[in-house]
């Protein structure tokens, strides 16, 4: 029997509007900050921050899986860009039959 080793990774995903896309939420926040006396704030952009854990055989496999998640659901790639960081959260775990 073979033993399969897996690793759990923690993903921090940052989704932001593309620079060419207007950001009405950012404009509203910037205006609100100005009304509160923060006149030195400019270029406010609002985005999304997502955290999740994924189990994979390798770091490359985890990266590919998170990349697909972002492309398919977590980001609207027509108007948003994304980037992510992955860090291991557990020691690798062996699964399967052992002799």
Language-model-detected regions and their locations in the chain:
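Long, contiguous binding/interaction regions
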Residues: 1-99
């Amino acid at each position: 029997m073979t033993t399969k080793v897996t690793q759990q990774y923690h993903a921090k995903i940052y989704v932001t509007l593309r620079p060419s896309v207007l950001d009405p939420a950012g404009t509203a926040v910037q205006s609100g900050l100005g009304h509160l006396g923060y006149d030195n704030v400019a270029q406010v952009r609002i985005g999304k921050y997502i955290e999740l854990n994924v189990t994979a055989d390798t770091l490359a496999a985890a990266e590919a899986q998170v990349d697909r998640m972002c492309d398919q659901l977590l980001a609207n790639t027509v108007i948003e860009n994304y980037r992510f960081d992955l860090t291991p959260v557990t020691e690798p775990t062996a699964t399967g039959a052992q002799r």
